C-alpha cells in the first residue's frame, strides 16, 4: 500500500474507535497477497501530547504544519467530543483538501459532524 495513512489524534479522541482499523492496517494480515502493511503516522494540530477519552496519552509524530498531502494515502479522523469546536477547523480544512486531491478520508462517529 503506497503512501502514508495519517491518524489524527486530539484531546477527547475516542481511542476505542480506531483499534480494529489500526491493527489491520499495521499488520496487513487480511490484505490481498502482495500488498504490504500500511504505514500509520499520528498527526496532531501540533506535537503537544493529547489525552484520549480513555485516558491514554499520545504524542503526535508530526504536526499539521509538517504534514505533506502528496504522500497521503488516507486520513483517519476518529470520533471525539470536540468536533464542533473551532479548534478543529484546521484539520477539517486539510480533510477537505484531501478530498479535493482524491485522497481517502475516514471520518468515524463524531468526526462526521465536523
Where are these regions (language model features)?
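Extended, subdomain-level signal for the structured scaffold at the beginning of enzyme domains
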Residues: 1-101, 114
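Short, thiol/selenol-centered motifs that function as redox-active sites or metal-ligating centers
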Residues: 108-109
Amino acid at each position: 500500500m503506497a503512501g502514508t495513512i495519517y491518524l489524527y489524534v486530539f484531546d477527547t479522541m475516542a481511542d476505542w474507535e480506531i483499534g480494529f482499523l489500526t491493527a489491520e492496517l499495521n499488520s496487513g494480515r487480511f490484505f490481498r497477497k502482495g500488498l504490504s502493511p500500511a504505514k500509520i503516522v499520528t498527526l496532531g494540530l501540533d506535537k503537544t501530547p493529547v489525552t484520549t477519552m480513555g485516558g491514554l496519552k499520545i504524542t503526535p509524530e508530526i504536526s499539521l504544519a509538517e504534514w505533506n498531502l502528496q504522500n497521503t494515502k488516507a486520513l483517519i479522523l476518529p470520533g471525539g467530543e470536540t468536533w464542533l469546536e473551532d479548534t478543529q477547523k484546521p484539520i477539517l480544512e486539510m480533510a477537505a483538501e484531501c478530498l479535493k486531491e482524491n485522497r481517502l478520508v475516514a471520518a468515524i462517529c463524531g468526526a462526521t459532524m465536523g
